[in-house]
């Protein structure tokens, strides 16, 4: 799993902090970073990791960033969900965005497979 996002990519703002806010203590910054890593891991696990540059493409990065920040914010606001291993219900919007990214991922994977595999021609003698 590769991490692509930092807490300044929208997570701080979604939790009510400014990106340039220096009043955050290291504990909260670490909690945000850990939550973001967990969110990215969840999202990538739900979608796939075979396609290089899928999550950083111009088309997909905004949705990927949005869903990861929403999930990470939920983790920060409900820390028991991470530490106790309790099941966290992913809301309908998060599920919908993950579903949309899954569709894009499947299409891109299909397109890439079509380019990577040469079509086999039948022998005219057959």
PLM feature segments, named:
Residues 1-60, 104-126:
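Conserved short "hinge" loops at termini or chain/domain junctions
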Residues 56-126:
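Short loop/turn elements at secondary-structure junctions
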């Amino acid at each position: 799993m590769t991490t692509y996002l930092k807490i300044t990519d929208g997570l701080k703002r979604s939790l009510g902090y400014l990106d340039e806010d220096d009043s955050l203590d290291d504990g909260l910054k670490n909690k945000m970073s850990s939550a973001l890593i967990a969110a990215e891991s969840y999202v990538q696990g739900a979608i796939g990791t075979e396609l290089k540059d899928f999550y950083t493409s111009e088309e997909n990065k905004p949705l990927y960033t949005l869903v990861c920040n929403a999930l990470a914010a939920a983790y920060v606001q409900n820390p028991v969900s991470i530490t106790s291993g309790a099941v966290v219900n992913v809301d309908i919007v998060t599920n919908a965005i993950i579903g949309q990214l899954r569709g894009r991922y499947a299409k891109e994977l299909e397109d890439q497979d079509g380019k990577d595999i040469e079509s086999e021609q039948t022998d005219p003698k057959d």
